[in-house]
């Protein structure tokens, strides 16, 4: 059986086109209980697998001179609503989120990150993560 290095092909194509950054990897956990909008863009529902594969992908990109943008901080796996069309609202406790969806973002580092356009009611009830100073500051201070 022939194995194809898809990651390598993408890196070569990006470099050929003069692109030096890619919005990967998706660190969101797959949640089979939801009609998860992240779907197969997630590596797994298991955070250890997501962390391991994400670190490998980031290392490969950096070794090739490309930068990565981890996404969707602090996590998009716990909602079934596509944030491109409506504002998802999550009512889960901060403790639950820290031990599940937010966990991968604490273990994987990248210079750049894309926030999740989600309202986490138990963290900041008035602003979605993209606009929440509290959530962004918490991420910067490694509270997630």
Residue locations for each model-derived region?
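Enzymes and membrane/adaptor proteins characterized by extended Gly/Ser/Thr/Asp/Glu-rich
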Residues: 1-49, 78-90, 116-129
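Second-shell residues forming the walls of enzyme active-site clefts
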Residues: 49-144
């Amino acid at each position: 059986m022939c194995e194809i290095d898809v990651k390598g092909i993408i890196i070569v194509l990006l470099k050929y086109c003069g692109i030096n950054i890619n919005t990967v990897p998706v660190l969101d956990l797959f949640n089979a209980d939801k009609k998860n909008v992240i779907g197969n863009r997630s590596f797994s529902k298991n955070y250890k697998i997501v962390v391991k594969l994400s670190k490998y992908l980031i290392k490969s990109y950096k070794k090739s001179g490309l930068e990565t943008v981890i996404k969707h901080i602090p996590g998009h796996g716990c909602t079934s609503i596509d944030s491109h069309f409506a504002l998802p609202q999550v009512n889960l406790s901060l403790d639950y989120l820290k031990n599940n969806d937010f966990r991968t973002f604490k273990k994987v580092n990248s210079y750049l990150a894309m926030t999740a356009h989600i309202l986490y009611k138990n963290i900041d009830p008035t602003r979605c993560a993209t606009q929440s100073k509290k959530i962004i500051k918490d991420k910067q201070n490694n509270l997630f």
